[in-house]
Swiss-Prot record:
Pathway where this protein functions: Purine metabolism; IMP biosynthesis via de novo pathway; 5-amino-1-(5-phospho-D-ribosyl)imidazole from N(2)-formyl-N(1)-(5-phospho-D-ribosyl)glycinamide: step 2/2
Protein name: Phosphoribosylformylglycinamidine cyclo-ligase
Family: Belongs to the AIR synthase family.
Main location: cytoplasm
Length: 351
């Protein structure tokens, strides 16, 4: 069979001509291997680069149940592109998934990432993955694999998207599902580090309206740094707390804020009544509310308002839990109590 004829003056095309640089992808793998190596832990059976990532469930688990989570960083990335600041969004990516699986009582074991772009910038991608590895170190899980997809025409130059996948394990008898929460239990709030990774479409709209100087000082750091502060990872302090006392329920305060996330762990017939004066509204949220003219109710269902994780314990355990978490470096407040739901009432109310 004769090969197809090409025009005499035509040159053969390569993948690079089509916009995909295999050499850049290889260079990125070489750059990120040291970051991934720092996250290695017991259970990892291979390095980065295989078709599949291997992990052996630790033998300490008698009846392990795997808990998985996946998430992205949302439109916070648009602000990262605008600021050319890529060192914190990797931690955001890890936090969004590991904090989610933590609320079931799971210890995060491993993490995989997906980085998609139109044209691969090796230095930018390496900066992002370094942040991912740092997030994995903070949560004690291994970065054991990932995918970098260079797709010409799919994303504008200088932009990318991220997705993360976390898998953890919990002893079957120790799954936390909120089923034991009862009237009189106490809701503790752990401080957030800032906006975390939700509500940024509204944040960007407020910035568009207010047109602030993002490099200006904002309570000791630039406004840009305050807006981009990475999502706090609560894994190690809360896993330690679970070894000492009974944690009945937890809620990662993400999209939907306090009023839509706490109900996810409450049985029907129970309401969490939160006292909005029980914790201080951080200056960044005051700034957003003032410059956006955002109503209180909207703030509570879009932003975390200074509380990144809610933890529900018995009243008898509340003081011990606060002391333990404070010693571990967390800021904690008693922000509410659990009571019977009144007719026509939501499962979380802020008073």
């Amino acid at each position: 069979m004769n090969p197809p004829k090409s025009a005499p003056d035509a040159q053969g095309l390569s993948y690079r001509d089509a916009g995909v640089d295999i050499d850049a992808g290889d260079a990125l793998i070489d750059k990120i291997k040291p970051f991934a190596k720092k996250t290695l832990r017991d259970g990892v059976l291979g390095g980065i680069g295989g078709f599949g990532a291997l992990f052996e469930v630790p033998k300490k688990y008698k009846e392990p149940v795997l808990v998985s989570g996946t998430d992205g960083v949302g439109t916070k990335l648009k602000l990262a592109f605008h600021l050319n600041k890529h060192d914190t969004v990797g931690q955001d990516l890890v936090a969004m998934s590991v904090n989610d699986i933590l609320v079931q009582g799971a210890e995060p074991l491993f993490f995989l990432d997906y980085f998609a772009c139109g044209k691969l910038d090796v230095d930018t991608a390496a900066t992002v993955v370094k942040g991912i590895a740092q997030g994995c170190e903070l949560s004690g899980c291994a970065l054991i694999g990932g995918e970098t997809a260079e797709m010409p025409g799919m994303y504008p130059d200088g932009e990318y998207d991220l997705a993360g996948f976390a898998v953890g394990a919990v002893e079957k008898s120790k799954i936390i599902d909120g089923s034991t929460i009862a009237e009189g239990d106490v809701v503790l709030g752990l401080a957030s580090s800032g906006i975390h990774s939700n509500g940024f479409s509204l944040v960007r709209k407020i910035i568009e309206r207010a047109n602030p100087d993002l490099s200006a000082d904002f309570h000791g750091r630039s406004l840009a740094d305050a807006l981009m502060a990475p999502t706090r990872i609560y894994v190690k302090p809360l896993l330690a707390l679970m070894q000492k006392l009974t944690v009945k329920g937890m809620a990662h305060i993400t999209g939907g804020g306090l009023v839509e996330n706490i109900p996810r762990v409450l049985r029907e017939g129970l309401t969490a009544e939160l006292d909005q004066d029980a914790w201080p509204l951080p200056p960044l949220f005051k700034w957003l509310q003032e410059h956006g003219g955002v109503a209180d109710a909207e703030m509570h269902r879009v932003f975390n308002c200074g509380i990144g994780m809610a933890v529900i314990v018995s009243a008898a355990d509340a003081d011990a839990a606060i002391a333990d978490l404070t010693a571990a470096g967390e800021q904690v407040w008693k922000i509410g109590t659990v009571r019977a739901t009144r007719e026509g009432e939501a499962q979380t109310v802020v008073v």
